[in-house]
A protein has these predicted regions:
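Transmembrane alpha-helices
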Residues: 45-48, 52-56, 64, 70-106
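Generic hydrophobic transmembrane alpha-helix motif, especially the helices
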Residues: 1-33
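Interhelical loop and adjacent transmembrane-helix boundary motif
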Residues: 104-154
């Protein structure tokens, strides 16, 4: 799916955005962001939907029985009850986006530039590793830098997952004990 989304962004989204906005670079950080969102939204939606459907039906019915509207019930009862799961879904989506390689390589222009402009080509950490690891000399300084980037990517992804787990466990324990 990552290659398909990257190719879709490369062919369709990039051309459309350049035609509509007149952005000088066809492949840029905006196109990469759209591609990453296409990859991440289904994951976040699926996990958040599971979290919302895990909320007991009795909470929903009790809120409606007390005179709340459907919107009030959703906002004040269902969403707070499912908040740990929704939070976990968002952080897992961020972790997936952070580690995505193919979409970033195909849709952002994969230019080794350091810029904050979203309309210029860019390169992510994962794309740098994916692009350069095949040509690097083993044991060289370049290899060490790529290895460090891999460790950095692992640490950030692991930290996001650990924070998610700790937060969700804390919220669930608090909810079911008190």
């Amino acid at each position: 799916p990552s290659v398909v989304i990257g190719f879709f962004c490369l062919v369709t989204v990039a051309s459309f955005l350049q035609d509509v906005t007149g952005i000088p670079y066809r492949l840029n950080a905006i196109v990469g962001g759209i591609g990453l969102s296409l990859a991440v939204i289904p994951i976040v939606f699926s996990i958040a939907e599971d979290a919302l459907s895990a909320v007991p039906r009795s909470l929903h019915e009790a809120s409606l029985a007390l005179g709340s509207t459907e919107w009030q019930t959703a906002y004040r009862v269902m969403l707070p009850a499912a908040a740990p799961g929704v939070f976990a879904a968002v952080l897992l989506g961020i972790g997936r986006a952070f580690g995505e390689t193919m979409i970033a390589i195909m849709a952002t222009g994969n230019a080794p530039l350091s810029t904050w402009s979203p309309i210029e080509p860019a390169r992510t950490v994962a794309a740098t590793i994916g692009s350069e690891m095949g040509e690097v000399v083993w044991g060289s300084e370049h290899y060490g830098v790529l290895f460090f980037l891999g460790v950095l990517l692992f640490v950030v992804s692991f930290s996001l997952n650990a924070i998610t787990e700790l937060y969700v466990k804390k919220r669930l324990i608090k909810r079911f004990q008190g």
